[in-house]
Amino acid sequence: PVSAMIGKTKEDKAVKQDILKKHTLEGVISLNKDTFYRVGTNPCIAIFTAGEPHQADKKAKFINFEDDGFEVKKHLGLVETERAKDKRQYLLDCWRGKVADFPSSFMVETTVEDTDEWLHSFYYYNDEIPTEADFMNSIADYLTFEFNMITHGKGYLFGQKGGDGNA
């Protein structure tokens, strides 16, 4: 599960450190959250080369394969769509280095340390420039939030003097 790649506890961190001392992390593939439908786990696949210590300059691949071409259908569970085969092939082509210009939203190649989260989401930086509509929506959301806070007596959070004795 994804939680094993995060390493929150001391024990988890020690395990990750021990793994890299003896094995090379080649990459981690984050899977569709519905892969094990109704089980309640976020699955991933970690790929290692056994018996070779992980070198500090070794780049590992972190792939977001949550959109794998499978969908949950009512009364059927997880069902393969017509896109699944192409998505699987694209994953394999990226993994094998046959695709050089992959989007960072799909795959990131980077060096790792035992203290890092070994997940695509840890390394991914959204490099897309927001549209004007995205900006306007963010401003509208903020103004709605601020108005709501002020009307509920929390104007002091925004530097306003109010009847509540704050600010």
Predicted regions mapped to residue ranges:
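A conserved structural/catalytic subdomain of Rossmann-like adenosyl-cofactor enzymes
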Residues: 1-167
